[in-house]
Swiss-Prot record:
Protein's organism: Xenopus laevis (African clawed frog)
Any one Gene Ontology BP term: determination of ventral identity
High-level lineage: Eukaryota, Metazoa, Chordata, Craniata, Vertebrata
Name recorded for this polypeptide: Homeobox protein vex1
UniProt entry keywords in alphabetical sequence: Developmental protein, DNA-binding, Homeobox, Nucleus, Transcription, Transcription regulation
DNA-binding region: 131-190
Pfam families tied to this protein: Homeodomain
GO molecular function, one term: DNA-binding transcription factor activity, RNA polymerase II-specific
Amino acid sequence: MEKRPYSVEWLSESSQRKAVYSNADLLGYKSGNPDKESNISLPSRATGPTLPSVDYREKENYCVRNVQNEERSPPVKDQLHSQPAPQELDTSRRALMVVPACERSTDQGNKVTGTTDTNKKAKPVCDEDAAARARTKFSPEQLEELERSFKENRYIGSSEKRRLSKVLKLSETQIKTWFQNRRMKFKRQTQDARVDAFFSGLYVPYYGYPDLPTPGYSVQPEFSVLAPHTMAAPSLPFGPLQSTVISPGLHPTAIPSANLGSYPYSSMLVHPMLNEPKRQRYSPY
């Protein structure tokens, strides 16, 4: 066997032949110096090495394994280049996304054909929801009968509900729902009427002062009093009143004395609302 520069093949052959070398000889072969390699003398087993032969073999095998691993393992640059590119990752993700899309298409096909049991159970639920959301249109005859029953009793009973269901050809649920909505509407109308009445001046204190006439306003008594019985009262559709009506908040002694005989129709009860067109009323808004 010819001596040649250090290589992995030579080390593998030497390890198979169970050659024993010292640390200095291994360093010389690793450096690749041919002059040093020519002066190497292999120790014989007869003379006996100073160190056990097993240690040399383990060290030699360890060096051979490291060299082989370095040659087999690619460099760091090659590892970076070997990593998948972003485009390859995108294609793999798209391939994974194709599978759920196919499953969705098969599910839609099953829904159309109605092969699965779950779809069969889901269809009646959707139909019930659509039927519940649909608004019932009542005919004028039905509304008239419902309004008549509502005027008699705002809270319908079971017997009346069954009667209306037979007469109007409606379900009891529809009649019950109509009465609930009608009660809410009645409640809103009542509240709105109270608010309008309050701000229209029916409940606002209103007093007039005949001693301080305004320009263009004829002086008339603002206090509701009854004329003496000696004066003739005009013909009225209602009977004569026998009591004296006094505005609230005023004591009878606090009413100023006025010559009622100078006013025409002084025997009539003059209400503040009768003079509404002649004077600008106070409006809170």
